[in-house]
């Protein structure tokens, strides 16, 4: 596992965006051989999306031959709802870059047959072979996507019940009322994420410090689903200074020295 210790949220977003652009450009995608990118929603990746849009407008990257798969979607929320992840992605990213509409894959939380929708999504991912890079965030309780504590580490795309803690955390997008946050969501599984060639998790804020500590220094534990990334051959944690507060000083020092050449010019 790599840990990229940076100073603040802005640097986390910039580093993550630069890493994605480097990966896409090194891959040299074509229509017949697209780059497959997994994407999250929420507050944490906002800076990364801003930088990706800026780099696209500067001519540094094209998303014409990029295929995306989003991590999750609320169940029962109309896709036109301002807080649906469909709306979030189009407002904050897709509408500002050159990605073709047919290359965008989002879970349908209003599907008549939820189980069939989850199977369809898994099969669509498999049809491309694998996701080359999956960017994500982490919850206060260590959840990745909507894989809440006690999720199976072998799980696939499915419906999940959201914990009260997650609904309270997401209530900031619903006028502060947790009762307006849907109780269920469709989410890629832990196993789905582990199948990706590379997984990059963005961690910002003191509130995520315990989750980061569990991911990096703790044991693999289904109560901290983020810890599953210790099993991944190519996992990266990109974090700001407040989120490292629960890590041992020597852990942060070790990774800071190890990644010194990779955090220049931020």
From Swiss-Prot:
Q: Which GO terms describe its cellular component?
A: cytoplasm
- The reply on keyword Cytoplasm is no
Per UniProt, activity regulation is:
Allosterically activated by N-acetylglucosamine 6-phosphate (GlcNAc6P).
Q: What is its EC number?
A: 3.5.99.6
Any one Gene Ontology BP term: glucosamine catabolic process
Give site residues, Part of the allosteric site.
Answer: 151, 158, 160-161, 254
**Which InterPro entries does this chain map to?**
Glc/Gal-6P_isomerase (IPR006148), Glucosamine6P_isomerase (IPR004547), Glucosamine6P_isomerase_CS (IPR018321), NagB/RpiA_transferase-like (IPR037171)
Q: In which pathway does it act?
A: Amino-sugar metabolism; N-acetylneuraminate degradation; D-fructose 6-phosphate from N-acetylneuraminate: step 5/5
Query: Which EC class does it fall in?
Result: hydrolase
| Keywords of this entry | Allosteric enzyme, Carbohydrate metabolism, Hydrolase
The reaction(s) catalysed by this protein are: alpha-D-glucosamine 6-phosphate + H2O = beta-D-fructose 6-phosphate + NH4(+)
Instruction: Provide any one GO MF term from the record.
Output: glucosamine-6-phosphate deaminase activity
Note whether Hydrolase occurs among the keywords: yes
Q: Which residues form the active site?
A: 72 (proton acceptor), 141 (for ring-opening step), 143 (proton acceptor), 148 (for ring-opening step)
Note the NCBIfam families from the entry. nagB, PRK00443.1-5
What PANTHER family does this protein's entry cite? GLUCOSAMINE-6-PHOSPHATE ISOMERASE
Similarity comment: Belongs to the glucosamine/galactosamine-6-phosphate isomerase family. NagB subfamily.
Q: What does this protein do?
A: Catalyzes the reversible isomerization-deamination of glucosamine 6-phosphate (GlcN6P) to form fructose 6-phosphate (Fru6P) and ammonium ion.
What's the subunit arrangement here? Answer: Homohexamer.
Q: Please state what the protein is called.
A: Glucosamine-6-phosphate deaminase
